[in-house]
A protein has these predicted regions:
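Catalytic-core environment of secreted peptidases
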Residues: 50, 62-93, 101
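N-terminal capping segment at the start of a domain
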Residues: 2-33
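Active-site nucleophile and cofactor-binding loops and adjacent substrate-binding regions
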Residues: 56-57, 90-96
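General beta-strand structural signal in soluble alpha/beta enzymes
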Residues: 54-58, 79-81, 121-123
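Acidic/histidine-rich catalytic neighborhood of metal-dependent amide-processing enzymes
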Residues: 86, 95-136
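Short glycine-enriched loops at secondary-structure junctions
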Residues: 9, 68-69, 83, 125-128
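A non-catalytic alpha/beta surface segment that caps or lines the substrate-entry region
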Residues: 22-67
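General structural feature for long, well-ordered alpha-helical segments within catalytic domains
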Residues: 5-12, 35, 39-43, 75, ...
Length: 136
């Protein structure tokens, strides 16, 4: 049985949660803001450190992709959520889905598991819809 590193996951959630935190303890990473970019840069770095291919599309969706040998033509399994926030957001909103997916992929890789298809982790842009419509 595989078990993710809960402490590692929570440390990343707290680290990302500090991005966009103001002096009053309010967390804000509006899409396309400097805080959103800082959060995306951080998650992108973690994806890269995990050995994933990191891609950002034209509207800012961030993807970390694991393509094991021999399955490049298979449709990927997509996991993820978003890391942008509304004003005064909760710490776990959205980022839990992205960071938990990253932790799962890292656990699978370390265990030696080789999936039959690529696995992509998405951090979708403007999920909260505060910058432009439609959202996500």
């Amino acid at each position: 049985m595989l078990i993710i590193n809960e402490e590692h996951l929570l440390k990343r959630i707290h680290t990302l949660g500090a991005v966009g935190l103001d002096a009053d303890g309010r967390r804000t990473r509006l899409a396309a803001s400097d805080e959103d970019k800082a959060g995306r840069d951080l998650v992108s770095r973690w994806m890269s450190e995990a050995g994933l291919t990191v891609v950002t599309d034209y509207i800012g969706n961030l993807f970390g992709i694991w393509v094991p040998e021999g399955c490049a033509d298979a449709a990927p399994l997509m996991l993820g959520s978003h890391i942008d926030t509304v004003i005064n957001a909760g710490q776990f909103d959205g980022c839990y889905g992205v960071l938990a997916a990253l932790e799962v992929v890292e656990t699978l890789k370390v265990s030696g598991f080789v999936p039959a298809r690529p696995i992509a982790i998405g951090a979708f842009a403007n999920e909260e819809g505060v910058r432009y419509a439609p959202d996500m």
